[in-house]
């Protein structure tokens, strides 16, 4: 696994064990969530130039050969080496973009197809994945994705074809429209609107009229069902001063508000979810309530530099999404009621929804808060009734005008109903838990016996880098299980924090380092291995062996 995969059927990695992965997928399924596997099959790592691992699964041994490597791999460098070594490559050239540093594999090869189909069936039928995210599909013909999807019977797939809109549409066609694709141009539309300028530049103010673009999959009724829309991902996010990439420079919530109101299949960036979970949950709830799908139609209502408004028609109701510096001044359209608002965004639900709306979602919170109750109704003057003890509200329960705030001071079950002409309708239930987060500390242990790095450094970060490379020199050790373990104490200071770490041999060109180890929240044990993923050393997570 990983971006330069060597093994297909071994799912133990620096992220955790195969057993932990299976447990996670099972828990997702129980919650009605399908897991999508990141499938990297354009290229594959080798031992030396040509040797792929032999892997036995269910009594069958699968192994790619040197003749499965594209003839012109690495711009012909591999062929030159093969001629020197007397090794044969495939007679077929690469079907797409060449990837340097790994062997580009020939998807026309029957052996390659056999191995990959077995691998994908293992992911779906054995591990339990629901779908696939095909990485770097510019490297091989889209017809193979159709073949692989047919062979595995996978429920869903999306391809990463990072290019212009016409080429993405052509790739979708090559898959016989059996796969979705990431809508990169949608992302660039949003970036340019937020930044106020194109190509990653930043103007003094945003220009939300730049959202009015036909250069995306989402605008086209024939392709929007295949569009996986997003506003940020791992390749565009800011990582460090040395790896700034192409992030949104402001208005993250407004960008997501637009994303979640529009057709296509929206994909939320995980760091955004962690940072803005309550707000994003409410946006998702509004999308679902209106019945907005990947095929919904929309019409523009306002297209100005400081205000952009679309009306989106769902299968149940309509939703107005307003974004821009003047979104707070926008009063909506006749027949709509504002249900959500924040910095530079607002949602309005059509009054035929006939429902109450609460602008703070169910969940756990560290302290009490206020939530606004809104009556969405075609009846003027409709009010709301509510209870905080889980009982069903009646016309005699506590009554409030639409748009009023109520206080949630402790754990409770809030039930809210729409009160129209003395009748209580469409009662909604919200579960709130108020529990203060207690900061805590935990240990990160590492064993470097296999690589014998001296000195050994530990570079840690949370949301952003807070220390300079190479981090803190590790000097303290413990003997556990007959092995010497270096260790470092770290802290979690709030409920959304994660700790990330890289072990390394110090600063300087050519100094070795491990792969990134991300998302730690509790004591963990890692062994640095001699094998590499690209130029970085792999680590083995052995936490389960020691945290007993």
Task: Indicate where each model-derived feature is located.
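A short, solvent-exposed beta-strand micro-motif common in secreted/extracellular proteins
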Residues: 373, 496-507
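Acidic/aromatic-lined carbohydrate-recognition and catalytic surfaces
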Residues: 1-99, 105, 138-159, 503
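Short proline/glycine-enriched turn/loop motifs at strand-loop junctions of beta-rich domains
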Residues: 263, 324-328, 375-383, 450-456, ...
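Aromatic-rich carbohydrate-binding modules that target alpha-glucans
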Residues: 392-402, 450-494, 506-516
């Amino acid at each position: 696994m990983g971006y330069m995969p060597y093994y297909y059927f071994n799912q133990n990695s620096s992220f955790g064990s195969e057993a932990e992965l299976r447990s996670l997928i099972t828990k997702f399924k129980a919650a009605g969530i399908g897991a999508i596997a990141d499938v990297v099959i354009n290229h594959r790592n080798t031992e030396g130039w040509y040797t792929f691992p032999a892997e036995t699964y269910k009594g069958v041994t699968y192994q790619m050969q040197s003749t499965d490597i594209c003839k012109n791999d690495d711009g012909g460098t591999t062929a030159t080496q093969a001629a020197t070594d007397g090794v044969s490559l495939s007679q077929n050239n690469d079907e797409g973009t060449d990837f340097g540093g790994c062997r580009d594999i020939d998807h026309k090869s029957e052996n390659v197809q056999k191995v990959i189909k077995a691998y994908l069936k293992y992911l779906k039928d054995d591990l339990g994945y629901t779908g696939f995210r095909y990485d770097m599909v510019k490297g091989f013909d889209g017809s193979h994705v159709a073949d692989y999807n047919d062979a595995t019977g996978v429920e869903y797939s999306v391809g990463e074809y990072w290019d212009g809109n016409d080429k993405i549409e052509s790739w979708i066609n090559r898959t016989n429209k059996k796969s979705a694709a990431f809508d990169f141009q949608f992302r660039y539309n949003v970036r340019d609107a937020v930044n106020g300028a194109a190509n990653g530049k930043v103007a003094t103010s945003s220009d939300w009229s730049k959202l009015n673009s036909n250069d995306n999959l989402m605008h086209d009724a024939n392709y929007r069902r295949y569009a996986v829309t997003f506003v940020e991902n791992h390749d565009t996010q800011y990582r460090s001063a040395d790896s700034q990439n192409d992030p949104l420079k402001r208005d993250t919530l407004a960008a997501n508000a637009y994303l979640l109101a529009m057709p296509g299949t929206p994909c939320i960036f995980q760091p955004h979810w962690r940072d803005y979970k309550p707000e994003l949950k409410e946006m998702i709830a509004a999308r679902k309530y209106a019945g907005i799908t990947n095929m919904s139609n929309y019409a523009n209502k306002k297209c100005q530099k400081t205000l952009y408004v679309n009306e989106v028609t769902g299968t149940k109701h309509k939703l107005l999404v307003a974004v821009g510096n003047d979104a707070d001044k926008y009063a909506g359209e006749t027949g709509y009621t504002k249900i959500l608002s924040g910095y530079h965004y607002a949602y309005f639900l059509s009054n035929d929804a006939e429902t109450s709306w609460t602008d703070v979602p169910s969940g756990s919170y560290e302290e009490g808060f206020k939530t606004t109750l809104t009556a969405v109704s075609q009846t003027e003057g409709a009010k709301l009734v509510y209870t905080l003890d889980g009982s069903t509200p009646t016309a005699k329960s506590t009554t409030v005008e639409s748009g009023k705030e109520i206080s949630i001071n402790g754990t409770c079950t809030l039930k809210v109903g729409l009160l129209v002409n003395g009748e209580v309708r469409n009662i909604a239930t919200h579960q709130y838990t108020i529990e203060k987060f207690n900061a805590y500390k935990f240990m990160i242990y590492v064993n470097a016996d296999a690589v014998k790095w001296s000195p050994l450094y530990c570079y840690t970060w949370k949301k952003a880098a807070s220390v300079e490379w190479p981090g803190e020199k590790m000097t303290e050790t413990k003997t556990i299980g007959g092995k010497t373990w270096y260790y470092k104490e770290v802290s979690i200071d709030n409920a959304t924090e994660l700790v990330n770490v890289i072990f390394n041999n110090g600063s300087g060109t050519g100094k070795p380092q491990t792969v990134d180890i991300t998302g730690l929240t509790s004591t963990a044990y890692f062994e640095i291995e001699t094998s590499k993923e690209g130029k970085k050393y792999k680590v083995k997570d052995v936490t389960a062996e020691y945290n007993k």
